[in-house]
Regions:
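Core of compact, soluble alpha-helical bundle domains
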Residues: 1-59, 85-110
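Alpha-helical transmembrane segments and their helix-membrane boundary motifs
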Residues: 61-78
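Short regulatory alpha-helical coupling segments
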Residues: 124-143, 158, 175-183
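Heptad-repeat coiled-coil signal-transmission/dimerization helices
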Residues: 127, 131-132, 148, 171, ...
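Active-site-flanking beta-strand signature of metal-NTP-handling nucleotidyl enzymes
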Residues: 146-151, 188
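GGDEF/GGEEF active-site signature
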Residues: 172-234
Length: 259
């Protein structure tokens, strides 16, 4: 590259601003506009793996509030500038970096869509979808599968008395305890307001008892729960039947605690 990485970065930013695709750039000073673009362009010039530099620049832009479409547009502007300078090989590298960035953003969006935003565990839809798949898998391979549902005792009263902020703290704490208790092969999710569930692959009654014991050591003081478990083959052949039986046993446990 005949021009310096710095000069090419300036030209790329101007290109993005002219195209109106890099709208957020207009809010930054000149140094802020460039960010780590010079490092990215220098990596292209040296035939280094430019993707890590592109991702570092993208993370920097994301921290400043840039939308993914603005970041991709800025990287594409770099490609157009290089193309005009006859740097076809570098342009191809830029295009590949944009593809990888879009793939990363798409994967992150897909994963975020599966997560409960408050607690970070699987949301209701994702957990039920996974349960259906695991039931089908367990039936095909004739393996064991257990579903355990949990309900935080007296959560509504605590929420009303101490406020939603305290209620949210309890939900996050219990979700963290569930994640800390589950094995890598297990799955945990939030399936209602204060209801959670765990799916134990190859789980039987002994595994469930051990899981609940470990969970109790992880749960913060002052948090108590009711639980109900159901097992594939325990009169259950579908995920709907598993949830129905686990719910009945959950409320049986809750009633016994209240008696």
């Amino acid at each position: 590259m005949e021009a310096s990485a710095w000069d090419l970065a300036v030209e790329s930013v101007e290109e993005a601003l002219r195209s109106r695709a890099g709208g957020s750039l207009a809010r930054l000073g000149r140094l802020g506009q460039l960010g780590s673009l010079p490092s990215f362009i220098a990596a292209l010039a040296d035939d280094d793996d430019a993707a890590p530099h592109a991702f570092a620049h993208a993370r920097e832009r994301e921290s400043l509030g840039f939308a993914p479409c603005e970041i991709a547009a800025e990287l594409l502007a770099v490609g157009r500038v290089l193309d005009r300078g006859g740097e076809r090989h570098a342009r191809a590298s830029v295009d590949r970096c944009v593809e990888l960035y879009v793939e990363r953003v798409t994967d992150e969006l897909a994963e975020n869509a599966r997560r409960d935003p408050l607690t970070g565990v699987l949301n209701q839809l994702a957990f039920h979808t996974l349960a259906e798949k695991e039931v089908a898998r367990a039936r095909r391979y004739r393996s064991q599968l257990a579903l355990v549902v949990f309900d935080l005792d007296n959560f509504k009263q605590t929420n009303d008395r101490n406020g939603h902020q305290e209620g949210d703290r309890l939900l996050r704490a219990f979700a963290a305890a569930l994640r800390g208790t589950a094995r890598e092969s297990d799955a945990v999710g939030r399936i209602g307001g204060d209801e959670f569930a765990a799916l134990l692959v190859q789980g039987d009654e002994r595994a469930v008892r051990a899981f609940v014991r470990r969970l109790h050591t992880e749960v913060p003081d002052g948090v108590s729960t009711s639980a109900g478990a159901a097992y594939l083959g325990d009169g259950c052949a579908t995920s709907e039947q598993l949830f129905a039986l686990a719910d009945r046993r959950l409320y049986g446990d809750k009633s016994a605690r209240a008696a």
